[in-house]
């Protein structure tokens, strides 16, 4: 038998009945039915049933008897239809089988510690044996789609005149780079490279170089606490262009995403709706709202100025600092019980709420703990503003605006999930625009996006009122990516550094190459980056970003497969001029 397959398993169908074929793969399952042996052969495409009958080929049957799970097999045989009533509708090849004429055991396997495709196996064990976990055809389908998406991205950007350029992986640490991964330099003792959190500065330098349109599918690194959609090393589609405005950049992003989704079997709108940052926060409590369902937050702070509750009345006195949000849930009073309302209250308490007030709309009128704290006039205005119907429930959140936005936005999502209001197959894109340039965190001014974003009203006295030409693209409540128009004038860049508390000496030390480049005729430019792993996670409806990365890290930033990170030898440390400080004993 030639060691050369003629088909992949799922390339065979009823049209191949009677043909001789050679297949290669792994034994997925093995069954001995009193002499006749059935082997489910698995390759990257899927599974097909092999049948070994001693009357057809004694030698093949002799080999088949010793086959066990995950043995590597090369099988030659003839395709035939399965018997009436023996078809398997769960398999793409469920109407046919292959009668073995020859069988080669190319390699044996130990008993696998995990069952291929068994999703009940713990993730740590699956990642430790990731090379086995990836044998699942479902995993192969994920990475085939990932490959299609990457090819589509390259073709799309190439078609729009973008040039693919690779930027350095070993680069310079920056002031905001507390989450940088550092690489010690052997030839420069005591000095370190940083792995890039993004190619931001290099792609700006390429615009100053006159490259006009750049892209790369870039590896990026960030040493941060992990969540379901975060990894310490990740991939992004990175794009930058010159002589453009915000609409130009967004148009390129929409065309790129349209081409990627088309290659993956989806049709999406040519253009996405826009939502300002302020409106997103006020109406949805999030700068990445999920708009697959209605249910906006409504401001009602003006209805509590005359409340007989001192706390509510005090909150209502400062409408700049505070918010009082109402969330009308259609049919919510019929859906939620006293017990489940208690669960929702505990849910919002985890995110800073003191409790969860509500009003139930019943046939006999309004009921609930909040009714007694509102005047007749305020209740009348509330009904006019929200227009609730019998069977609805209205939830309320009050307090400092950022806190209220956060927990009421989370409540909105949680209610929608519990009530089954979200269509998992719907793709809802939008742009969030007009972001603030800065935010204050414990009194310190920070850039909301990054310090290279072009501000709009830099002379505003209140830094929190300064806005930026920045934009995020959101899909189904997930930030898919974002970008901005960049600062291309040295004076503006220095002013932004100053507002961020970066002293001129520090700015010169850390960003001298950028500030120098801005003196030599930098063009107006802007760009964006799309989180590629996150994009594939959404396209495949995977619960975790780890499912779409071949060899991911755990939520503790470790690799169970390779046991990384790991200690290194004292000789290596010595060469790098590093000494590990011994842990001090505490008693």
UniProtKB/Swiss-Prot annotation:
Pfam families: GAD, tRNA-synt_2, tRNA_anti-codon. GO terms for molecular function: aspartate-tRNA ligase activity; aspartate-tRNA(Asn) ligase activity; ATP binding; nucleic acid binding. It is an enzyme of class 6 (ligase). Its EC number is 6.1.1.23. Keywords: Aminoacyl-tRNA synthetase, ATP-binding, Cytoplasm, Ligase, Nucleotide-binding, Protein biosynthesis. InterPro entries: Aa-tRNA-synt_II, aa-tRNA-synth_II, aa-tRNA-synth_II/BPL/LPL, Asp-tRNA-ligase_1, Asp-tRNA-ligase_1_N, Asp/Asn-tRNA-synth_IIb, AspRS_core, GAD-like_sf. ATP binds at residues 222-224, 231, 479, 531-534. L-aspartate binds at residues 176, 222, 449, 486. It catalyses: tRNA(Asx) + L-aspartate + ATP = L-aspartyl-tRNA(Asx) + AMP + diphosphate. GO terms for biological process: aspartyl-tRNA aminoacylation. SUPFAM superfamilies: Class II aaRS and biotin synthetases, GAD domain-like, Nucleic acid-binding proteins. Residues 200-203 are annotated as: Aspartate. Its main location: cytoplasm. Transmembrane segments: none annotated. PANTHER family: ASPARTATE--TRNA LIGASE, MITOCHONDRIAL, ASPARTYL/LYSYL-TRNA SYNTHETASE. Homodimer. Belongs to the class-II aminoacyl-tRNA synthetase family. Type 1 subfamily. This is Aspartate--tRNA(Asp/Asn) ligase. It comes from Wolinella succinogenes (strain ATCC 29543 / DSM 1740 / CCUG 13145 / JCM 31913 / LMG 7466 / NCTC 11488 / FDC 602W).
């Amino acid at each position: 038998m030639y060691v050369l397959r003629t088909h992949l398993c799922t390339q065979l169908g009823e049209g191949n009945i009677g043909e001789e074929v050679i297949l290669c793969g792994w034994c997925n399952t093995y069954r001995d039915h009193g002499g006749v042996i059935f082997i489910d052969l698995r390759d990257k495409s899927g599974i097909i049933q092999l049948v070994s009958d001693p009357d057809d080929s004694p030698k093949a049957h002799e080999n088949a008897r010793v086959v066990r799970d995950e043995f590597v097999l090369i099988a030659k045989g003839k395709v035939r239809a399965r018997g009436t009533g023996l078809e398997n509708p769960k398999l793409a090849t469920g109407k046919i089988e292959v009668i073995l004429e020859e069988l080669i055991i190319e390699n044996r396997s130990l008993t696998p510690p995990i069952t291929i495709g068994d999703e009940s196996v713990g993730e740590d064990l699956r990642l430790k044996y990731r090379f086995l976990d990836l044998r699942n055809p479902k995993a192969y389908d994920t990475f085939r789609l990932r490959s299609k998406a990457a090819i589509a991205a390259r073709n799309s950007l190439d078609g729009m005149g973008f040039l693919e350029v690779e930027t350095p992986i070993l680069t310079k640490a920056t002031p905001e780079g507390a989450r940088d991964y550092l690489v010690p330099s052997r030839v420069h003792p005591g000095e370190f490279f940083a792995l890039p959190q993004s190619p931001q500065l290099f792609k700006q330098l390429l615009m100053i170089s006159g490259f006009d349109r750049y892209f790369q599918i870039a590896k990026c690194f960030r040493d941060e606490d992990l969540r379901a959609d975060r990894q310490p090393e990740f991939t992004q589609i990175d794009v930058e262009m010159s002589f453009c405005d915000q609409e130009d950049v967004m148009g390129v992003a929409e065309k790129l995403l349209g081409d990627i989704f088309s290659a993956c079997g989806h049709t999406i709108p040519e253009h996405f709706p826009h939502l300002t940052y302020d409106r997103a926060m006020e109406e949805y409590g999030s700068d990445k709202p999920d708009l697959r369902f209605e249910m906006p937050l409504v401001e009602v702070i003006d209805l509590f100025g005359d409340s007989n509750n001192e706390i509510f009345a005090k909150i209502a006195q400062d409408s700049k600092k505070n918010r009082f949000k109402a969330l009308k849930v259609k049919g919510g009073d019929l859906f939620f019980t006293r017990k489940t309302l208690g669960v929702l209250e505990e849910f919002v308490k985890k995110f800073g709420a003191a409790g969860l007030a509500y009003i139930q709309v019943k046939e006999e009128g309004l009921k609930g703990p909040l009714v007694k704290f509102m005047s007749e006039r305020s209740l009348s205005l509330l009904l006019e503003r929200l227009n609730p119907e019998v069977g609805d429930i209205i939830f309320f959140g009050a307090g400092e605006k950022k806190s209220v936005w956060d927990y009421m936005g989370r409540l909105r999502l949680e209610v929608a999930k519990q009530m089954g209001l979200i269509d998992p197959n719907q793709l809802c894109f939008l742009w969030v625009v007009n972001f603030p340039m800065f935010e204050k965190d414990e009194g310190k001014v920070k850039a909301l996006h990054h310090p290279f974003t072009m501000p709009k009203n830099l002379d505003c006295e209140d830094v929190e009122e300064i806005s930026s030409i920045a934009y995020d693209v959101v899909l189904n409540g997930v930030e898919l990516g974002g970008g901005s128009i960049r600062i291309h004038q040295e004076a503006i860049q220095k002013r932004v550094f100053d507002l961020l508390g970066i002293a001129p000496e520090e700015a010169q030390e850390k960003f001298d190459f950028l500030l120098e480049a801005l003196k030599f005729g930098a063009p107006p430019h802007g760009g964006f980056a799309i989180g590629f792993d996150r994009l594939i996670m959404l396209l495949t409806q995977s619960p975790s970003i780890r499912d779409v990365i071949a060899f991911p890290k755990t939520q503790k930033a470790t690799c169970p497969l390779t046991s990384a990170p790991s200690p290194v030898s004292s000789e290596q440390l010595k060469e790098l001029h590093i000494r590990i400080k011994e842990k001090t004993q505490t008693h």
